[in-house]
Design a protein with these regions (language model features):
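Conserved pre-motif I regulatory segment
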Residues: 231-276
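A contiguous, basic/glycine-rich beta-loop/short-helix subdomain that forms a polymer-engagement track
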Residues: 399-424, 434, 539-666, 715-717, ...
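Conserved non-catalytic scaffold segment of RNase H-like nuclease domains
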Residues: 2-120, 133-155
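Signature of the SF2 helicase/ATPase Hel1-core->accessory helical subdomain module
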Residues: 315, 323, 400-423, 427-538, ...
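Conserved RecA-like P-loop NTPase helicase motor core
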Residues: 654-665, 717-813
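Walker A/P-loop
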Residues: 271-292
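A substrate-engagement module of RecA-like helicase motors
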Residues: 240-244, 302-303, 307-422
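Acidic two-metal-ion nuclease catalytic site recognized across multiple nuclease folds
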Residues: 2-7, 170-241
Length: 844
């Protein structure tokens, strides 16, 4: 590859394998498929089962839908090795996670005496991370769903290979639409990457298969998508007029309670009143408050700040609900999403990233991903590209090094747009930031308000960890590394390098000493080491200040000094919480930067806050909302549906011991109930635990129960991705997911028929007498919100049917029983033994 019309004629062999495991030296290939792509078309496909190994584990059978009978008459790999080698000859070997498929196939060839060495390797995972920058996950089925590619039977080699081939074609076509300047930049960046992406880009540029720069504006060495402007003034409209238009256009059912909600919210906006409003799930509160806000703006020209809890809800409001209302009134409704400034790409930080030479794969991919994303984004909101782990750390480091310059292009543009919008939308975490930046707005609507307190507490918290601080100092580097120190030395006299290196060595040792003191809970030693670190950093800053090209390294180390000062102040004022105590490298120090009183003071100019939720009232009242309202009066309103969870039954076993993770009988009882469910229904099941210790013990017990041999056990560990586990759970038919509180909310359980979820404990600790008032003010409301969210996993719609098994009798014999169960019909709350549970399952 590289010149002439090679790209036009080049063949790609897209390979996918299904195997009995992940070890290429021990496990076997059970299905192989090769799809040949040429000239952006699929021209051939070869697929076969293989019989080198026919005994399959339950997990492999469930994952692939391949059973032993399909393999019995299939060839062995040695029988087809020559044919496969011929198919691959002269092609670019391509796969989704190419290291896995290439490694397995190369090992299989080797066992047949064939030395397979392709000239080029291409990984569609790597390509997707760069050229599909908005994707959050890169499993093939997730990408296929996002792009609308057909993949009805994931984890079968024939369908996976074809979907990967279609993905490759999509990626190549997208690369060809990029302007030549960007592609040349991507080509130079990609050279150090492990696989042969640079050759593909070179061929595209050489053959002039590129787009133009129309609709783009240049910023230094890169382009940004030019955003189209234009505003129209809204015509005045009452709540009733907007609601009638919405119903007529959408064809939705007219609901008196929904219109009542809209009018109540409009009145609170108009009168500048505080309002706490609980409205049951399904009443349509989002459309109700949007109609109230739009009418309020059209009549009075005043803007409203709306806050909600999750990205998916923000997307629903801005893309789906707003579009329905725009169609109803026949004109666009200006709205803008806004967050804190640090959540938008800092162009100065990006320029710095591009200027630094670094062959680290993650940094290269980050640079390339950002170059592509800037041609697409209208907002510059970093959440669009889901920076995680090293990517996030590298960008944050560059942002610190860039300092407070003029690079906040996207944030400033969002602020300008907010000044002309009907409403500004944010999420709870950034609510206070938006209140700070929008002093003209004095009215706030908080949707999903039961989540607000937790989000604000998270926002007020800064976390210090051993690994993060080591990484931060490591970014300064050594003279031989292409990082900050080497860049500084290249512009200055090298005589000072020994002093700087010595200081960095001491700072690294200082981090070890700080976290050793934290591990030992020795506050005096910790403060001594913090002060020592501050002095070392001051010496470093003094040594570089005023020299040539010192600003980047100075900004970086000055930020580190501020980190140490903040940590020291928190330790002295006892504003911290420690997490972890066994492993030095996993210890975290959570520091509270502000309290709720200071947040209320920052929001002092807000005249009216309307809090909305499906789960807001607790124990007949709203007193727990005083963390936000303080001593200001507020109205309250409940629009309830006594049969909200009418399709969900709650079963509480009466024949199990009290909750005790050290009681073998209690653990055995949980396992027995799980086994009964599996044997009676044959359906998938999710079991949620309050801690990993109990989860691990239950998992250990399942190994001795025969029922579990026919089911895949998905077990969450401290290192597991809950998203990946949920994806596997939704894909499999016969499986059990053992998880923790990370699955309590925001998940979509996919199951045919009745959904079942088992909960080992109500989501709060046993109340302590010494903390009784705090229990009713904080712990109980939070537990009720969590419990209703969990119930909402098994019944998302009125027609759904669900079963919630709760191994916690407190829900029946404590004063707070009705607080948890008020939306469940009494006949749906069942207490019984194992036999009655079997009867319940048979009647589902």
């Amino acid at each position: 590859m590289g010149t002439g019309d090679e790209m036009q004629n080049q063949k790609f062999a897209v390979v996918d394998l299904e195997t009995t495991g992940n070890n290429k030296n021990k496990d076997s290939i059970i299905q192989l498929s090769i799809v040949v792509v040429q000239d952006l078309k699929i021209i051939d496909q070869y697929t076969t089962f293989l019989s080198d190994e026919t005994e399959l584990t339950p997990f492999i059978r469930e994952l692939t839908n391949i059973d032993s009978s399909m393999l019995e008459d299939a060839p062995k790999f040695r029988d087809i090795a020559s044919r496969v080698a011929g198919l691959l000859d002269g092609c670019i070997f391509t796969a989704h996670n190419v290291e896995f498929d290439f490694g397995f196939l190369q090992s299989a060839f080797k066992s047949c005496g064939i030395d397979y060495q392709p000239n080029h390797l291409l990984d569609t995972v790597e390509l997707s991370k760069i050229f599909l920058p908005r994707l959050e996950r890169f499993q093939l089925n997730e990408i296929a769903q996002a792009l609308g590619l057909e993949l009805s039977n994931a984890h079968r080699a024939d369908e996976d290979a074809r979907a990967t081939a279609e993905l490759l074609i999509h990626l190549l076509q997208k690369m060809m639409t990029l302007d030549a300047e960007t592609l040349k930049h991507l080509y130079h960046l990609s050279k150090p990457l492990k696989y042969n992406l640079s050759d593909v880009i070179f061929s595209i540029v050489a053959e002039s298969h590129t787009g133009d720069a129309e609709g783009l504006e240049r910023h230094g060495d890169f382009y940004i998508r030019r955003k189209k402007g234009g505003r129209r003034k809204m015509e005045a409209a009452t709540v009733g007029e907007l609601y009638d238009g919405y119903i007529a256009h959408s064809g939705r059912r007219y609901r008196t309670e929904q219109l009542r909600l809209a009018n109540e919210i409009f009145e609170a906006l108009e009168q500048k009143e505080n309002l706490a409003l609980e409205a049951y799930t399904g009443v349509g509160k989002t459309i109700a408050f949007l109609i109230a806000v739009i009418s309020f703006h059209s009549l009075y020209g005043q803007k409203v700040l709306i806050s909600t809890s999750k990205k998916i809800l923000q997307h629903q409001i801005l893309i789906e609900d707003l579009a329905a209302l725009e169609a109803a009134i026949g004109m666009p409704i200006p709205a803008v999403a806004l967050k804190g400034r640090e959540n938008y790409l800092n162009l100065d930080a990006f320029k710095l990233l591009l200027s630094l030479e670094d062959n680290n794969t993650e940094i290269i991919q980050l640079k390339m991903k950002l170059l592509v994303w800037l041609l697409e984004t209208d907002t510059g909101d970093l959440s669009e590209i889901h920076l995680r782990g090293p990517e996030r750390a590298y960008y944050r480091t560059a942002s610190i090094q860039a300092g407070e310059g003029a690079g906040h292009f996207f944030f400033n543009r969002a602020l300008t747009e907010a000044g002309h919008a009907t409403f500004t939308l944010t999420n709870h975490y950034f609510l206070i930031d938006c209140i700070d930046h929008l002093p003209d707005i004095d009215t706030v609507i908080v949707d999903e308000a039961h989540q607000l307190k937790r989000s604000l507490e998270e926002r007020m918290k800064t976390t210090f960890s051993y690994q993060a601080m080591k990484f931060f100092i490591g970014q300064v580097g050594t003279p031989s590394q292409e990082r900050l120190l080497a860049n500084y030395i290249s512009h200055n006299d090298a005589t000072s390098v020994y002093l700087l290196e010595d200081i960095l060595k001491h700072l690294n040792q200082n981090i070890d000493k700080m976290f050793t003191a934290i591990e030992a809970r020795n506050t005096s030693d910790l403060l001594h080491h913090i002060d020592t670190g501050i002095r070392h950093t001051s010496t470093f800053l003094g040594a570089v200040r005023g020299t040539r090209n010192y600003q980047f390294i100075y900004n970086h180390m000055h930020h580190y000094q501020k980190m140490l000062n903040a940590l020291g102040a928190a330790i002295r004022q006892n504003r911290y919480v420690l997490e972890g105590n066994r492993n030095l490298q996993k210890i975290k120090v959570h520091v509270q930067q502000e309290d709720m009183a200071s947040l209320r003071e920052r929001a002092g100019h807000i005249k009216a806050t309307i809090m909305l939720s499906g789960t807001l009232e607790v124990n007949g009242g709203f007193s727990h909302l005083d963390y936000w309202y303080g001593d200001r009066p507020f109205k309250s309103l409940i629009v309830q549906n006594e049969n909200l969870f009418g399709g969900t039954k709650i079963f509480i076993p009466e024949d199990i011991p009290a909750y005790d993770i050290n009681d073998d009988d209690f653990i055995a009882a949980i396992v027995e109930y799980i086994a009964v469910y599996l044997s009676e229904t044959g359906q998938k099941l999710m079991v949620l635990f309050s801690n990993f210790e109990l989860l691990d013990k239950v998992h250990e017990y399942t190994a001795d129960v025969q029922t579990f041999e026919d089911f895949v056990i998905l077990r969450q560990t401290r290192m597991s991705s809950s998203e990946k586990l949920l994806s596997q759970f939704n894909h499999l038919d016969r499986c059990v997911l053992l998880g923790t509180s990370s699955f309590n909310e925001g998940i979509n359980m996919q199951a045919s028929g009745t959904k079942c979820l088992m909960l080992t404990k109500l989501p709060f600790p046993v109340p302590k007498k010494s903390d009784f008032r705090n229990f009713y003010k904080n712990d109980l409301p939070e537990a009720v919100f969590q419990f209703r969210q969990i119930a909402g996993r098994v019944q998302r719609r009125p027609e759904d049917r669900g079963l919630l098994l709760l191994f916690d009798k407190r829900i029946l014999d404590r004063k707070y029983r009705n607080t948890f169960l008020k939306y469940f019909p009494s006949e749906n709350v069942i207490q019984g033994d194992g036999e009655s549970f079997k009867g319940l399952l048979r009647d589902l």
